[in-house]
Amino acid sequence: MNQAVRFRPVITFALAFILIITWFAPRADAAAQWQAGTAYKQGDLVTYLNKDYECIQPHTALTGWEPSNVPALWKYVGEGTGGGTPTPDTTPPTVPAGLTSSLVTDTSVNLTWNASTDNVGVTGYEVYRNGTLVANTSTTTAVVTGLTAGTTYVFTVKAKDAAGNLSAASTSLSVTTSTGSSNPGPSGSKWLIGYWHNFDNGSTNIKLRNVSTAYDVINVSFAEPISPGSGTLAFTPYNATVEEFKSDIAYLQSQGKKVLISMGGANGRIELTDATKKRQQFEDSLKSIISTYGFNGLDIDLEGSSLSLNAGDTDFRSPTTPKIVNLINGVKALKSHFGANFVLTAAPETAYVQGGYLNYGGPWGAYLPVIHALRNDLTLLHVQHYNTGSMVGLDGRSYAQGTADFHVAMAQMLLQGFNVGGSSGPFFSPLRPDQIAIGVPASQQAAGGGYTAPAELQKALNYLIKGVSYGGSYTLRQPAGYVGLKGIMTWSINWDAYTNNQFSNAHRPFLNGLSTQKTEEVVY
């Protein structure tokens, strides 16, 4: 018998068996389920809620960073969990609703709308002005700048998903810009803000009137409680009589400077735990201090346990922690008492502001209810970009203090806004650019960490204000920048003098150069 004929059935059966095994065998490259705590690299495939995603940026997954929630980290690639050809997504998101405006100035407007929904996930929104695309954002708010005073504009918003599907335009909104701004402050368009020590810590002992003329705003540090737990604050000049100090303040004011009393500091624990006695002590004592010396306003520099959220206080829009509620009401009373020209600033640490992006509770985000409630009263917010370590930006990446990327990422969180306590949390709306300055140490000796060389800081400011990229890791969500961003705060004037004013000598000319550009001018 012919051997070829003899063994053909066996070969045919074996081949059929192999084909069957091949056909039903699971794919080796099937996407694994997404899991928090797993380190993912670029190109990794995962499945989440029966949808496949590809990692586009290396990271370690955290709860709240699910692929559908973080388009900066994951790209949707199709339906199904077991491989095969993905089903194309052709369904557009729903139309954005509830488009409203707020914080309208002569050159800018803040727009807010309700979130759209999508069968896979909304990745962003396009903002149109008079039919022209002017901004892209991944949040439900946008600050449109570069507008003309006294002009009416028509805005619409469209939602988009990862597949590029675009919703229909929202209902149009007409906004008319104002004819000018009334936010009080120095007449210069870019400010240098410094803290002056009312104590001797080995840096430099300076008479208040001898502060470098490079500074626009001088925060006298500090008014502190007269005893632990008291709501009464006190201030006594340490190197001058009361009359001499009043004369020094008047002298600086004659030069166009603003001189504020700063309350708190690292050692000044202020906790207004009751709405009657302590809050009244707080208001009365600050009214007396401000009136006695002729200060232009108040700087809030509360640290440590002075601001901390109680358990169960979960929404910055309606805080329940007594010492936070009482602080808000007390400051509002001071603003009302002294009137529209009262200058109000704040210098929180990053944990108390940007730290609320991922976690909201205890100290994390504890300043947010204060900033939110006072946003229409606040002249300037200069978060301390030092003594903080690394912080996470809007792109989900961690940035180290003392770098241009850190300054850009932290500033943009306030310029763009962010969800508090995770991607599903309530949205903290952005402040105006002219309400934002960057806080840095004046020298290596001034802080435990975060000192930034002048060239590095100016690199960050050129990107933030003019949109001039330095090729860093963080990418601005508004490529043109924020021309109205106000300037630089430093701790401190005394530490600057310790190094022969190297800090102010480097940054004053730089800020003057920025001031020649068109900005959202603040007139006092």
Curated annotation (Swiss-Prot):
CDD domains assigned to the protein according to its UniProt record, in alphabetical order: ChiA1_BD, FN3, GH18_chitinase_D-like
EC number annotated for this UniProt entry: 3.2.1.14
Residue stretches making up the Fibronectin type-III domain: 95-180
Reactions the enzyme catalyzes: Random endo-hydrolysis of N-acetyl-beta-D-glucosaminide (1->4)-beta-linkages in chitin and chitodextrins
Keywords from the UniProt entry: Carbohydrate metabolism, Chitin degradation, Glycosidase, Hydrolase, Polysaccharide degradation, Signal
One annotated GO molecular function: carbohydrate binding
Residue stretches spanning the membrane: none
Domain GH18 span(s) in chain numbering: 190-514
Pfam families for the chain: CBM_5_12 (PF02839), fn3 (PF00041), Glyco_hydro_18 (PF00704)
Active site: 303 (proton donor)
Signal peptide coordinates: 1-30
Family in the record: Belongs to the glycosyl hydrolase 18 family. Chitinase class II subfamily.
Name of this protein: Chitinase D
